[in-house]
């Protein structure tokens, strides 16, 4: 994972205070604290056994956090999504999460293989980059922050790159 910068973590805190329920969540009626603590240990974070929520974990990292179990999104805390509402994806498999993105059908078709690679302990962690063109320079691209301005020139457009780091975790209690 990336070293966490204080100003970035503060921006995450502000965004969570503003839009918290739409940015994060977990599958209802599931105690995910053991999985969250397991992830915190794997990431070598300070005080991993004190983490009780996905927000606790996310506020220790620059990266947004999604936890998949058995191919389903169990918990998420994405403070700066690109025009989507993270909490709406809870309980969905990887393919369904990405149905509405560019080239979504290709991604949906490849999702079983992608999910397998993402959980492959032998492969270990990997980093990938996702890009988009947007009409706002703001870090938060949440749908509630939509910029109504229509770009007129190329100078009105912004290139946005997201870093995604995948870290497969060893199974705990029969789940991964």
Which role does the model predict for each range below?
Residues 1-176:
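Extended, well-ordered protein cores
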């Amino acid at each position: 994972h990336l070293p966490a910068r204080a100003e970035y973590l503060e921006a995450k805190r502000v965004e969570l205070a503003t839009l918290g329920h739409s940015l994060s969540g977990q599958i209802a009626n599931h105690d995910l604290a053991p999985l969250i603590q397991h992830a915190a240990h794997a990431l070598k974070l300070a005080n991993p056994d004190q983490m009780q929520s996905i927000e606790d974990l996310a506020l220790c990292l620059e990266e947004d956090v999604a936890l998949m179990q058995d191919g389903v999104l169990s918990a998420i805390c994405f403070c700066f999504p690109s025009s989507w509402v993270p909490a709406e994806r809870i309980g969905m498999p990887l393919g369904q999460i990405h149905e509405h993105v560019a080239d979504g059908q290709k991604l949906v078709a490849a999702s079983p293989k992608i999910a397998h690679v993402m959980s492959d302990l032998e492969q270990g962690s990997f980093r990938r980059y996702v890009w988009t063109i947007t009409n706002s320079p703001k870090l938060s691209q949440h749908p509630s922050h939509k910029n109504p301005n229509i770009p007129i020139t190329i100078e009105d457009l912004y290139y946005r790159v997201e870093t995604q780091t995948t870290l497969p975790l060893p199974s705990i209690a029969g789940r991964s």
